[in-house]
Amino acid sequence: MADNKRIVLAYSGGLDTSVAISYLKERTGKDVVAVSLDVGQGGESLETIKQRALACGAVESYVVDARDEFANEYCMKALKANAMYEGVYPLVSAISRPLISKHLVRAAHQFGADTISHGCTGKGNDQVRFEVSIASIDPTLKAISPIRDLSLTRDVEIAFAKEHKLPITQTEKSPYSIDQNVWGRAIETGFLEDPWNGPTKDCYSYTDDPAFPPVEDEVVIEFKEGVPVKIDGRDVTPLQAIEEMNRRAGAQGVGRIDLIEDRLVGIKSRELYEAPGAVALITAHQELENCCLEREQHRIKRDIDKRWGELVYDAQWFSPATQSLNAFIEDTQKYVSGEIRMVLHGGRAVVTGRRSDSSLYDYKLATYDSGDTFDQKSSNGFIDIYGLPSRVAAARDVKFGNGIEVPENTVE
């Protein structure tokens, strides 16, 4: 049985976490197991990252292609919940942290570790998301951050790498702090911390300039119980649906987001995001729900969706509250099946058509033309009953001299 003197490190392959392998071992005396996940972020292959981790001193390197798992079990939950924190942010980073945490815990159990390390600062949301998620899965594990807890600054990293001759090619530091996956991309940088400064073109990667779009792109997305299953008649998996909509909506500049965001840790921050596939799919899904959900159910779900997004943003993916909301949301999706036609153009995803066998839209009831089956005479009795509380309250107000004053007609 493996000893319990190891640390599992969330390893990205970059300078920070490459240095952290040897730094953690030197500072704590524990061997380090590097854990890397592919959640659709692109870049280097998992094999390249694995070999770099071993070359930097990791005793084991645990790598996982988690793209389908992420799309199926995390992105689709966010889609069904129409998750938009503060009305605009589709939780790009927030939904990946619970998945990464799950694999960190799995690796800790597999390799006999008692501590999990991540690369977060003490100022952001992700430190909370990782550590609360880890504690929710296995509360016996400890969590540390070299940057936050062991004073691992970038200057220390560079000096440490040179001194220990670590196999890391040091390139000019990008001015941007990037976190990306298949659901979207988060961009932070020093000059954007002034909220008056506009983003420059080189901030963006997933989206083209919406001011210069190509010819409009019409797409038909078919959903089954809230999940996209076909695009333009072709079968797709959730991952394929997200990837295709990233390409097509991104080419039209859809999904650029620039906001002042209320962070979990209590500060406001300026955030820049790109999420073309997420924004287009959520727009389509919301419109299908407009067709298929009963009015009161739909009203309640809109409130639940908002709260779900807040809980997940606030590191509560595994909480009992979120699990209960998941059950409600999943139940609402049993009739959310059908097709949505959208036009992607100039930064917008506009729904132009919808059809569903389970739609509650009834043409014969809605039309004002011949064939109308709605009995308009029924409205008289409905209005009498519906307006009764207002009439009773108005009569009381008049009785006590508080009736609504109507100005005299001054027209001569």
Curated annotation (Swiss-Prot):
ATP binds at A10, Y11, S12, G13, G14, L15, D16, T17, S18, G119. Its EC number is 6.3.4.5. SUPFAM superfamilies: Adenine nucleotide alpha hydrolases-like, Argininosuccinate synthetase, C-terminal domain. Belongs to the argininosuccinate synthase family. Type 1 subfamily. It comes from the Bacteria. Pfam families: Arginosuc_syn_C (PF20979), Arginosuc_synth (PF00764). InterPro entries: Arginosuc_syn_C, Arginosuc_syn_N, Arginosuc_synth, Arginosuc_synth_CS, Arginosuc_synth_type_1_subfam, AS_cat/multimer_dom_body, Rossmann-like_a/b/a_fold. Pathway: Amino-acid biosynthesis; L-arginine biosynthesis; L-arginine from L-ornithine and carbamoyl phosphate: step 2/3. L-citrulline binds at Y89, N125, R129, S177, E261, Y273. It is found in: Cytoplasm. Homotetramer. GO terms for cellular component: cytoplasm. It catalyses: L-citrulline + L-aspartate + ATP = 2-(N(omega)-L-arginino)succinate + AMP + diphosphate + H(+). Keywords: Amino-acid biosynthesis, Arginine biosynthesis, ATP-binding, Cytoplasm, Ligase, Nucleotide-binding. GO terms for biological process: argininosuccinate metabolic process; L-arginine biosynthetic process; urea cycle. Transmembrane segments: none annotated. The gene is argG. CDD domains: ASS (cd01999). PANTHER family: ARGININOSUCCINATE SYNTHASE. HAMAP family: Arg_succ_synth_type1 (MF_00005). L-aspartate binds at T121, N125, D126. This is Argininosuccinate synthase. One of its GO terms (molecular function) is ATP binding. It comes from Bifidobacterium longum (strain DJO10A). Its main location: cytoplasm. The keyword Plastid does not apply.
